[in-house]
């Protein structure tokens, strides 16, 4: 066996087991975001402004044109400042506007400020109101022309078709049970197909048959209409009929009907196919695709030269078919299956370069062009320059983005031909029919909505304003535009709060594809077909990485090599194969899903010799959705790399090929939840993608140019470049991420070191020398240990705690704002009423905690007082106050305290105040932010996982001396349950363990790429080389007794991650706390500081044991017996017996609900006396009882803990004074 070869990944050398020669490096992983936003800035904005201008008033005297746009100056704040100040990272957008007065010929030009436009950061994110957000790309149905077939009750095939625009009305073709053809316009009522054709000018049977050939279905439809016996002009009758269907209840007239049809399908403002729609229409409806491989039923003659292109009865090859189309022939008779001729009608589009003499590459028209317009241009002039100018001028007519009459005829012809096997039906889940809308396009659509709203305002203003004094500035109101953009970034479901747990999570978030969102699918309506893995996903979308749960299959990830083309379709690269020699070339082609279906494609791992010739005579290839074996000379293409089918997350799993897909899915998802650790360590067993994933995620700092390090400190690196310039790189230290993990960068270069451009000079979170390092390499043993690893639990050694192996830093942010209230402004101060000196010892003179202080739950972070409502003053008091000045006003303590269960070290304090000129929300005078950091060691209850979906919860931390140890005395770090492997079928973890053991002994770092990694024999070889047992098993000794265990145990190094599901964030306890307003039961959940729900089934359990008193107090004094719980609290404080429970509040609510249904419900005692149901205490004074149990209620109460202490006293006094033990309504 050959040894692995050393490969350099950045600064790290790994021994790679990969055998496939990679011609193409991984592309830049954030390209989809960056490229799309750049397109928007360069082209997208211009397109929208061009679409909307000119805006005319109703009399067409004023014209408003948007000429140009530019970004004026840099962003106001840097990215870091924006995060601190809750600002948006944006640049001012200016648009050059021209106002033309047609009557006087006067032209006014102005540069108009169109608001602050959010700008993408270097790492593909946006900062909106201080929060880092990502715009997820959307996967939607592409506009185009789709046909489908279904089987009806009689077992006949029924065809249907739909013309779907980017925006505008749908046109649907349908066949009903009696084979009558009908059309649905914009999802309204059906119209007969022939009626629509008449409305479009084919007004009698002869014209229709001339156009489409004779067809029984058309005949039947025409006969049915003839029986109606309408008089008058057939075109007008048809128009009126269509209008009646579309606008039932309105009086029809021919003019309105004509306008309606025009505006529905032929008005560029109302109907838009977009570039991609036109491309798909031409692809589907052009002639050649339907006639090739058919026999001609008549001679086909070139209309220009008169030569016969194909004779009757001849087979039309691909070449002849394209020749026919380019010659401008739009109608061809071919033989359908049963020797019957059928007329195929195209949509009258041709290739531009066949008709003009010059090179068309410089006019930027790649699509087929509409023939009638082209003929019109060519007939006006012969001058080449003039033709060029006309083509540029009439580009929107040559390549129309709305329907043409020929499109509708071609679609009708296609629809008719399906019955005879001419044309194909479409699979809507095929990636050739789904496209990606990335940031740029989503923003463009939003901008378009804003401009359309603005246009309405401008039109109205044009009519109101005086024509002579009007300027562009007075006409334009930018509010609709800025509002549309703000709304998109703030509340669109596709604008997501960035997942920043670790660099991989951030990278994946930016490479997401979501089928949800506006214009997409909804979770409830999406069936299995949409969610399924499709053969066209190969190399474009990852079949593994998708969430578990309701979104499975709707949210996916971009494959490693995939890219989005100009139409929004996903493309993946292949290497070309020289068919004659059966030799793989280095030429790379990118193909979309529908182009790929016609080729035979071999696997990247197919063995080839030095020259690249296939070794095997028969080669396994993919062909459409089939996998077949063909002769080596038939292969067209070969995959570029084995990892091209999976996403970045998945390509980080070594031995992926040995894992079950379901577990690999969990592995991919859990890597994104790994917490950045204090000390990072890259995996011994990697896949070679770690370096690129870390560098492209943008958390590392790369040198911009070659040079020498001049100075290094913890937070900046100075490099003197070889070209004489100097670069200073600032590092981020201990910043809080969106998820509360810690973002910290540290330099990895020394003073005087030479660096190359693009070299990693500083590591970020979860990276180690420029490689992704999400977890730690630990020594694991697979064996049961006293039942502590039952059901996936994990037993760990105390060494991992002591040596901070799995310690992570978490930073929480607390904020406190001083506002203006009705009674006066709140004040941030050290002088807090009723608080001892001990509580404020760590506050500075302003009343803000000092940096470095250690705080526990309940400690004051920011002292704040709020003015209290004053009582009416007596005359004497008023007099005294007038003489001696203002007496200290009553204030109450509303300080910011550390929440229950939190705490740590204060690492940073930021103070913003209106006086210093900081921008604050209205009504806020001061804002203080306190950052508290915690060092969290690994503890019982934390969740850990490997990279293969092997997850578990820590059940016990054993002293090192009790852990099982190896013959040389090394104790293992983790003991895992061997029963977690066989049924889960993730054998990758075992291979990783074995190879890790060998690699650690040899001092290697290994790269074993997915689907091209180390085989079993390679691992055996490495174990032998390291002088270890080739089975990978070892005798282990019990740490408690020193005896060897009965059997040999699998031991080795595995890469284990600590996940973000930490026990500290989940554990929760409550004695008293907030109550729901209506039912008076405790709230639920940690966030509300709620109680434990004692539900229906738990009640049954206690009933089954007859535990009546336990049950009684659970349902009353521990929950919603308002008076009882106060008395109980009092009794416990005084050490008395607990009193009798009263009536639960929820019973009173039930009685009230019954009374509201007009049922007279009374509560009677044993001797038929009515029991008064006292109303519960006034809303403002919420009594706080014991209540730690919630029996139902889920309403959340607003904080009403104004003056708890005083209220307790009042309540207690009232209770003692009252003999009956009932509390009367207390009014303070």
Curated annotation (Swiss-Prot):
Skewed-composition ranges (Acidic residues): 1192-1202
GO MF annotation: an example: DNA binding
This protein's record includes keyword Transcription: yes
GO BP annotations, alphabetical order: DNA-templated transcription
A Pfam match: RNA_pol_Rpb2_7
Chain spans, region Disordered: 1175-1204
Gene3D superfamilies according to UniProt: 2.40.50.100, 2.40.50.150, 3.90.1100.10, DNA-directed RNA polymerase, beta subunit, external 1 domain (2.30.150.10), DNA-directed RNA polymerase, subunit 2, domain 6 (2.40.270.10), RNA polymerase alpha subunit dimerisation domain (3.90.1800.10), RNA polymerase Rpb2, domain 2 (3.90.1110.10)
Any GO CC annotation of this UniProt entry: DNA-directed RNA polymerase complex
Superkingdom of this protein's organism: Bacteria
UniProt xrefs under PANTHER family: DNA-DIRECTED RNA POLYMERASE I SUBUNIT 2
Name listed for the protein in its UniProt record: DNA-directed RNA polymerase subunit beta
Species this protein is from: Caldicellulosiruptor bescii (strain ATCC BAA-1888 / DSM 6725 / KCTC 15123 / Z-1320) (Anaerocellum thermophilum)
Gene: rpoB
